[in-house]
């Protein structure tokens, strides 16, 4: 088959062809009229100026002299009459694409034949749009192809087209930058064949956005990633790719999020500012969507959110200077939310009390203010920016964000000083310890932990044993759990762990003796008041390690001769710090192993929380190896299994209505679960109980207002109505066993449900 026989024209709409043809015909008619009139005038001039030559033309060339411009107008009118008669358009003959045709196209494309490349790309376009309807006709628009042919086309194009087009366009064999594409767009090869690259990228994007099979989408994204740099030539297509990749990254499972992120990261590195700002904004918003959670969180979901956070941190490390502006805006938003919660929470001075008496915020407004802060979205955003600042602590661009972020985290920890929110406080302490370690800045964390230990809920006698509590999978606990021994044990052990980590960071400082003095005094006082022996032993062990480290530093400090403001202070105990030889550092290692064993016993998933969570580089390399192993096999992914059928499935109105009814039933069952919570007697606990109910209904930030201002003790009213209804039914019906079972019981709607719906 010759090169010209294999050529397949790219699709052009009928309207465009007709308009182009009509405009060309009009131009030709106008031009021919002008030429005819000019020619007739020239002949008249010739007859007047040179009659002898005119006679010669009459004898030799009569046709030239017999020319008349009126004849042209007559011919034109007759042509219009003929054109006004409608002609029957010939029907298109749809030819099926066979395996022999595909094999010949593939071989020709490997040899660099342009006709074969066009044909295989046209077949790829037909495969990507297979099963879609065109206009009002229900018949398929494109040629028929079998499943084996479709698989062959998809695999060949996705695996080899980037290399083939690079050779055709004289582009670098791998990678490239924006400047390379800018130079390439001036060449003749790009002007001739550049639209082939666009055809390949457009249809691949259609596959990514339309397919529902995650394995096929991941394979497509992984293969198209090699051509990412060529999107610099198509800005509109680049924006669509960024939007599609953010969607697959945030909503996908398996290998799809990782492959999508690697594609997005390559775009930001290779193209720079063209897509970096859009990607930084979009990936943060997509991360927020995944953080909409209820009261508690599972281990698998926590691990997934940590992976997404690592991706965000990696993308913000690409260009710290551009990332600073976006990070500053987002951290400022968190500060504004915290400021609103602090101002509405309650007065602190007599002057504030007088001002509050004049303008009293409603109970609903107060609940809404600090629910925005004690929400999973807000907490995970703080952890995200903590990891970003700690990961770029050596960069001067992001280092100034450490101070405002520390202020926000400290304010969140002190917002509601209640034992029910100890999980949030412990998370905040972990974040502050990470910032202090990364930046080398002292942060007064010990006061937050010592205030926890001195609360009456941890020092008093528990009411029950209770179940084991994982403080890092919840953001608050109920009132019954606070009074259990398991909760006391989890809080005290976690506080000791974080306090030891904080002091171990500064156990090599020349001022450690003075720094740890107040902490030592308060721990000794707590040791006297605590009643449980196991808690007393735990605190005594920590006190012993603090004293040993203070003596260790004092002995080393006695042998030096420089003053405290001498620059040589920075080198004090530098060798011991690198070796981690202080007593507190060794004690922290044993505590870390113990806390890890405790977490493993609580969680079957063994999710590590904090700085040691899911390492990005290790996961990246493992996923890359798995993807390469899958790509080695030719038939690893069968596109024909789902591609030929999934696009044809359309939901009927009945199915949609059934789905809406099913979702409505699910919402009702969730509300039933929320109503089983017992309201507390104290005013503060009543607010927190209602907050727990609203958190289960909706975990978004800010929390939507689901309660009513006139909501007062709905359970008692509901029970009274049900008793009255049962009494009336018993009076009307005789007391028979059969009658009570046959008749349907009338359900009394709960007032709280009625108000919500």
Swiss-Prot record:
GO molecular function list: protein homodimerization activity
Keyword Nucleus (UniProt): yes
Keywords in alphabetical order: Nucleus
Biased composition (Acidic residues): 1-28, 67-77, 668-713
GO biological process, one term: ribosomal large subunit biogenesis
InterPro entries assigned: Noc2
Localization: Nucleus
Compositionally biased region (Basic and acidic residues): 78-89, 619-628, 644-655
This protein's GO CC annotations: Noc1p-Noc2p complex; Noc2p-Noc3p complex; nucleolus; nucleoplasm
Location of the region described as Disordered in the Swiss-Prot/TrEMBL record: 1-37, 67-89, 616-757
Family classification: Belongs to the NOC2 family.
Official protein name in the record: Nucleolar complex protein 2 homolog
Organism the protein comes from: Oryza sativa subsp. japonica
């Amino acid at each position: 088959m010759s090169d010209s026989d294999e050529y397949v024209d790219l699709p052009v709409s009928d309207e465009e062809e007709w308009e182009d043809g009509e405009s060309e015909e009009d131009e030709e008619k106008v031009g021919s009229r002008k030429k005819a009139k000019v020619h007739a005038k020239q002949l008249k001039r010739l007859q007047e100026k040179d009659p002898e030559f005119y006679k010669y033309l009459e004898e030799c060339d009569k046709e030239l002299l017999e020319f008349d411009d009126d004849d042209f107008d007559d011919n034109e009118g007759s042509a219009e009459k003929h054109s006004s008669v409608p002609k029957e358009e010939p029907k298109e003959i749809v030819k099926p694409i066979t395996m022999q045709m595909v094999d010949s196209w593939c071989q020709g494309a490997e040899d660099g034949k342009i006709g074969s490349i066009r044909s295989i790309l046209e077949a790829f376009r037909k495969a990507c749009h297979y099963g879609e309807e065109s206009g009002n006709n229900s018949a398929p628009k494109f040629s028929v192809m079998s499943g084996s042919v479709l698989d062959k086309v998809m695999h060949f194009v996705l695996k080899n087209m980037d290399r083939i087009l690079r050779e055709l366009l004289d582009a670098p064999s791998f990678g490239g930058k924006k400047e390379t594409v800018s130079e390439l767009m001036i060449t003749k090869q790009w002007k001739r064949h550049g639209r082939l690259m666009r055809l390949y990228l457009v249809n691949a994007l259609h596959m990514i956005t339309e397919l529902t099979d995650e394995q096929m989408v991941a394979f497509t994204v992984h293969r198209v990633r090699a051509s990412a740099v060529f999107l610099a030539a198509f800005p509109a297509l680049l924006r669509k790719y960024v939007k599609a990749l953010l969607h697959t990254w945030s909503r996908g499972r398996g290998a799809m999020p990782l492959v999508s992120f690697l594609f997005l990261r390559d775009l930001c590195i290779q193209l720079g500012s063209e897509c970096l700002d859009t990607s930084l904004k979009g990936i943060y918003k997509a991360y927020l969507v995944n953080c909409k959670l209820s009261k508690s969180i599972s281990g698998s979901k926590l691990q997934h959110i940590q992976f997404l956070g690592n991706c965000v941190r990696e993308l913000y490390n690409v260009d710290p200077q551009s990332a600073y502006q976006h990070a500053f805006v987002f951290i400022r938003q968190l500060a504004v939310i915290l400021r609103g919660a602090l101002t509405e929470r309650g007065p602190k001075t007599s002057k504030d009390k007088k001002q509050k008496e004049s303008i009293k915020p409603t109970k609903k407004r107060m609940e809404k203010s600090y629910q925005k802060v004690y929400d999973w979205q807000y907490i995970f955003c703080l952890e995200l920016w903590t990891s970003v600042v700690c990961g770029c602590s050596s960069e001067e661009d992001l280092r100034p964000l450490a101070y405002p972020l520390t202020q926000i985290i400290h304010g969140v920890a002190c917002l509601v000083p209640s034992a029910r929110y100890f999980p949030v406080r412990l998370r905040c302490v972990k974040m502050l310890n990470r910032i202090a370690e990364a930046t080398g800045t002292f942060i007064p964390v010990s006061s937050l932990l010592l205030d926890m230990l001195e609360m009456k809920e941890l020092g008093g006698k528990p009411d029950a044993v209770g179940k084991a509590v994982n403080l890092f999978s919840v953001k608050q606990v109920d009132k019954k759990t606070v009074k259990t021994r398991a909760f006391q044990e989890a809080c005290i052990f976690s506080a000791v762990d974080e306090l030891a980590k904080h002091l171990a960071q500064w156990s090599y400082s020349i001022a450690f003796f003075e720094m740890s003095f107040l902490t030592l005094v308060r721990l000794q006082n707590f040791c006297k008041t605590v009643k449980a022996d196991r808690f007393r032993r735990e605190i005594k062990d920590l006190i012993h390690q603090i004293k040993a480290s203070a003596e260790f530093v004092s002995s080393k400090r006695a042998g030096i001769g420089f003053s405290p403001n001498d620059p040589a202070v920075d080198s004090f105990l530098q060798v011991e710090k690198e070796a981690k030889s202080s007593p507190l550092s060794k004690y922290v290692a044993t505590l870390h192993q113990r806390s890890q064993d405790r977490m493993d016993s609580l969680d079957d998933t063994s999710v590590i929380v904090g700085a040691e969570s899911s390492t990005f580089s290790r996961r990246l390399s493992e996923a890359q190896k798995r993807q390469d192993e899958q790509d080695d096999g030719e038939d690893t992914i069968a596109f024909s299994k789902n591609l030929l059928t999934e696009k044809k499935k359309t939901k009927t109105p009945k199915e949609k209505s059934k789905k809406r009814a099913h979702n409505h039933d699910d919402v009702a069952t969730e509300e039933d679960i929320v109503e089983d919570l017992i309201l507390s007697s104290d005013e503060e606990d009543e607010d927190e109980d209602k907050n727990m109910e609203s958190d289960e209904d909706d975990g978004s930030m800010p929390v939507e207002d689901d309660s009513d201002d006139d909501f007062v003790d709905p359970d008692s009213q509901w029970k009274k109505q049900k008793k009255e209804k049962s009494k009336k039914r018993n009076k009307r019906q005789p007391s028979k066993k059969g009658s009570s079972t046959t008749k349907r019981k009338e359900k009394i709607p709960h007032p709280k449900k009625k108000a919500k719906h």
